Amino acid sequence: MWKSFPVFREYIRYTTASSVYEARLAYEEFGSKAHTYSPAYTDTDFPVIMQCSSHITFNSFSQFRRFYSMVKASGEKISCGIRINPEYSEVEVELYNPCAPGTRFGVTADLLPETLPEGIEGFHCHCHCESSSYELEHTLQHIEETFARWFPQIKWLNLGGGHLMTRKDYDTEHLISLLKGLKARYPHLEIILEPGSAFTWQTGPLVASVVDIVENRGIKTAILDVSFTCHMPDCLEMPYQPAVRGAEALPVDAIKTALTEENIYRLGGNSCLSGDYMGSWRFDHPLQVGERIVLEDMIHYTMVKTNMFNGIHHPSIAIWHTDNTLEVYKDFRYEDYRDRMSDGN
């Protein structure tokens, strides 16, 4: 949704990127060079990464050694860093736990040399996912205990993303206190946060329609014109059951013992994947074909992970302005599907 960047520019000046395309989008459309991190850079992508980045974090010293000479020779003003792994995270879902045992992310303290290589100016870590300031407090304790002896050698500390500071119960005053305390202890360090999904938390529903209702062994499924597999993959991967406007989310297995008069439905996607369905929801009326189903909070970690499996039609992307007008950003067409696999005519 790069067309919404003017809104973001009212609040922030910088962006982050994890790939060459994200870095280009940040540079060309947002208008700032990105703080870029990737698990691995390639010879093909790295020249463009340098053009579009103010900071580049390397996942390993082997990657740093491979590409740092290119940074020096480029003439670009780029600050390089290394991703550290404090081996501590309170993220419970392993899919999103960057510090899980055996993770491919970052360098542990036992592998850091006492004297950092020339050119390493910062540390980057990412240990959170929709986390509170209190989880950050615990993480900082581990980082300082483990890595503080290297702090005199660096200029910046990037605490990554996953800070859900726009959630209603997030303690922003506690966050401010933590950051001020950290800065007081290490006044030479620039402290960086990448709040990520906090910018779009609870800002974007996915509006679907019921296209059929089927019943098998007492389980009623409302088949929608969208797909969990294609349009909401995070729901299946986590997994988590999204909020549906006007419906009560029930335990997943509740539908297996539901009575007909209870209006309890499973929601099914319109792909051919057997597992393209989710949960149990109780509605206050029997669902009808053509009825709208609004799935809440479907922007972050959902819209960006969509795919075109089965050639399923993608939902359009639009913004609802404060003057009550709707602006369509992207209306997906057959050509978008066709041209992903071969160049169009």
Model-predicted regions and their roles:
Residues 88-90, 129, 165, 199, ...:
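Feature marks short, surface-exposed loop/turn motifs that line or immediately flank catalytic pockets
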Residues 2-6, 133-138, 166-175, 202-208, ...:
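Short glycine/threonine-rich loop-to-helix capping motif typified by GTGT followed
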Residues 1-156, 170, 178-181, 185:
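Active-site-proximal beta-alpha core segment in soluble small-molecule metabolic enzymes
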Residues 84-86, 161, 228:
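Short, small-residue-rich loop/turn micro-motifs
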Residues 126-128, 157-166, 195-198:
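Glycine-rich beta-strand-to-loop/alpha-helix junction loops that act as flexible
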Residues 178, 193-345:
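Charged (often Lys/Glu-rich) extended helix/loop segments that serve as interaction or gating elements
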